[in-house]
Amino acid sequence: MTPLFHLENIVRTYPDPASRDPHAVRTVLNLSELDIRAGKILGSRGHNGSGKSTLLRIIALLEPPDSGTVLFEGRPAGTDDLHLRRQVTLLLQTPYLLSRSVASNVAYGLRVRGIRNASELQNRIAASLLAVGLDPAVFLHRRRHELSGGECQRVALAARLALRPRVLLMDEPTASVDQQSAERIALAARHAADSGSAVVVVSHDHEWITPLSDRLVTLREGKLVE
């Protein structure tokens, strides 16, 4: 079966701030091959600077590699493909929420996508909050300042789940959350995969990411190690 994403011979470099040579670069990602499949959770671990976040940005089509091939369902994928970018969503380590109600935050992306039907909005908001373990009856009208850090991250994840993405990317999603939120985030990621999404999670938390992942890889100095 053709993977959703296929990455091959991916190289990404950035200017080297430690060098006096203005043309000097450092290689942050040197990836031979990686497949991302629907219905599976790919876990990636590694230390800071190992290339984990860069890998996610390339998969999210937010930045291109210097060289290499990125295919989506066998077709070339680039940062200018807005239709494809809408099928991929990225959850960051530090959630950004609007200073509005939880309902407004979850609905924001749906409205941007053109969903205006009140019943559909209500159903999607409620379902996504339940998926991250937040009772809509309790949290729907709460505002950002009334939420804990873990609850903010779960609302941010709910907003992405409401979009029903084909690819869900999560960058250190449990780095600043409590144990209960970490467990709920893991359950939500598994539910997304079981519903058909491809899920890619990067984390330095070995104990959290290992049981969650269908496949676990390690990035070391930009290179993939099983």
Predicted regions and their residues:
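Helix-to-loop junction immediately C-terminal to a conserved catalytic motif
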Residues: 60
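ABC ATPase NBD coupling module
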Residues: 76-89, 112, 194
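Conserved ABC transporter NBD signature motif
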Residues: 68-78, 84, 134
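H-loop/switch region of ABC-family ATPase nucleotide-binding domains
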Residues: 203-204
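Conserved ABC ATPase signature
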Residues: 143-147, 151
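The feature captures the beta-strand-to-loop junction immediately N-terminal to the Walker
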Residues: 45-47
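Catalytic Walker B motif of ABC-type/P-loop ATPase nucleotide-binding domains
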Residues: 168-171
